[in-house]
Amino acid sequence: MEKILSDGFAALGITPDAEAVGRLKAYYEYLEERNKVMNLTAISGLEDVARLHFLDCAALLTVCDFADKKVIDVGTGAGFPGLVLKIVQPEIDITLLDSLNKRIDFLGEMSEKLELERICCVHARAEEIPEERRAAYDIAVSRAVARLGTLCELCLPYLRVGGRFIAMKGPDCADEVAEAENAMHLL
């Protein structure tokens, strides 16, 4: 895993410290163990998790400056991308939001095992925005949750004025972007 991560991070221009790489390895091991009984992710195996989860999520760090930002990951699932961002850039203040309590329990356990600070795991539906979280974040991220128009409606209310929303989408998203333009302008 270290070689895959090392090569991948170098290609992205990211230089995580040894502690971050160690935490990603521990994350992988615990994810694989718990995935056997919880169905956290369809992607498994060292190489696939390293490339398709860890490096894919870490690539967000090349999009904008996350340092010392307050970030929410809406529909985090097994912690993608939010937990990976937190591990690679620990100074992020992150909230992991998911509607399934079993995932939030897993993320709480994982955060504790990795001794992560400034991380909050919240069990809630994205559309049920608690008042204290409305307009409270600098950055909202989401990966593999819903179509872009729906994501705009779910994620944008969490952002402060001037905040950034980053939706991780596949290469064939042009139709989704065109479809979501109205929602983006209205919100």
What positions do the PLM features span?
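Conserved glycine-centered beta->alpha loop in an early N-terminal alpha/beta scaffold
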Residues: 75
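Conserved SAM-binding loop of SAM-dependent methyltransferases across substrates and taxa
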Residues: 78-91
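S-adenosylmethionine
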Residues: 91-95, 99-187
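Class I SAM-dependent transferase core
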Residues: 1-68, 72, 102-119
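Residue-level signal for inorganic ion chemistry
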Residues: 31, 85, 169
